Design a protein with these regions (language model features):
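Eukaryotic scaffold repeat domains enriched in small/polar residues
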Residues: 20-364
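Bacterial N-terminal signal peptides
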Residues: 5-16
Length: 364
């Protein structure tokens, strides 16, 4: 069966790569960024903004690496803030929560429950709309456990444990309420739970072959219950059904300008940025995903270099792109999460610029 999956995946890989190569010159999409759309109280500050989500009322949830506590290195850095649709601050959710360690992603489900993935504590938490914890996935390492070394990367990695994570990154749901969690930096798998929180299995392992992963960084589901996984280190998006069967592999092949600015660090070397498992800074490598509501759904994808957002059809055709790396409005510094409550309305969480942006697109 595994050989069949690999063969199927390789067939789709070749076809999707060819298709995306044909879309090498999609148009730039004009857009605006709403100035000062979030209004923070005088005594609150964002740290690196790792997550952003929008509920059915238009409320915006920002997950930031603010409220830092502890030593300079290894400090806890996670804070969840809610804003109204007008950008006015409403409340902090989960102040001093036991799970807070290193903020990674926030999502809102169809019932307006708020979900948070914390990479540092290896925990996913579900809050109800009132802000109370109603479900917990995974377990934070015990403070008294001398063997707890969550930042170690043994090679080969230790075997995954059912129901537990190692540097978890994101979560999504299907129409039946099953939960899919991208687990993430180390375990390199998708973990599945039923709607009551019971373990239902997993798929994936480290590697670059079809069905394998190198940093699952974001995960979303469309209305057909197809699961899109941002396989960041391999610079691709893998699409599965709810049982873990590989359906297709999507790649974004839109070349970056030779003079494209870099958000931070040295310019990615072409050879290193395209090597298997080392595609994190390759143009089009997926850092963040979101899918618009219907009736026609679109997939938005963000990369770190050259700092673009791409608009795709669900079968991987690139319709256009917007943005570039930088520090002023309409520029981006490592987009870490996207929310797209409408086709032409996109919310952006940025790590390097410590901010969120609300974008209004004006496609021609």
């Amino acid at each position: 069966m595994k050989a069949v999956w690999l063969a199927l995946g390789m067939t789709f890989l070749l076809s999707r790569t060819a298709e995306c190569t044909a879309q090498s010159s999609p148009p730039e999409i004009p857009f605006d960024s709403v100035p000062d759309f979030l209004q923070l109280p005088a005594d609150l500050y964002f740290g690196e903004v790792s997550g952003i989500a929008v509920n059915s009322k238009g409320h915006v949830f920002v997950l930031s690496r603010g409220n830092t506590t502890g030593p300079a290195y290894g400090a806890a850095a996670a804070q969840l803030l809610e804003f109204g649709s007008d950008g006015k601050f409403l409340r902090e959710i989960g102040h001093n929560l036991y799970a807070w360690s290193y903020a990674h992603a926030v999502r809102v489900d169809r019932d307006d429950n708020i979900w948070v993935a914390d990479k540092g504590s290896d925990v996913v938490v579900r809050f109800n709309p009132q802000g109370r914890v109603t479900m917990v996935f995974g377990r934070k390492p015990e403070a008294s456990d001398e063997s707890a070394h969550p930042l170690e990367h043994p090679s080969p990695p230790k075997p995954p444990v059912d129901g537990m994570f190692r540097q978890v990154t994101d979560m999504t749901w299907d129409s039946a309420g099953n939960v899919y969690i991208s687990d993430g930096y180390i375990n390199s798998r998708v973990a599945k739970f039923d709607r009551e929180g019971n373990w239902a299995g997993s798929w994936g392992e480290p590697g670059s072959a079809p069905g394998q992963f190198s940093t699952l960084h974001s995960i979303v589901t469309d209305k057909q219950d197809r699961i899109y996984v941002a396989d960041r280190g391999n610079a691709r998006i893998q699409v599965f059904d709810t049982s873990g069967k590989l359906l297709s592999i999507l790649r974004i092949d839109v070349p970056a300008p030779r003079d494209a600015p870099v958000a931070i660090g040295n310019r990615p070397a072409e050879a290193g940025a395209t090597a298997a498992g080392n595609g994190t800074l390759r143009p089009g490598s997926p850092w963040a995903l979101c899918i618009t509501p219907g009736p026609t759904q679109y997939l938005y994808v963000a990369d770190a270099f050259p700092g673009r957002i791409y608009k795709l059809t669900l079968d991987g055709r690139v319709l256009g792109w917007l943005g570039s790396s930088g520090k002023v409005l309409k520029k981006f510094g490592w987009i870490h999460e996207l929310a797209c409550p409408a086709e032409n309305e996109v919310f952006v969480a940025e790590l390097l610029n410590w901010r969120a942006q609300k974008l209004i697109l004006h496609p021609r």
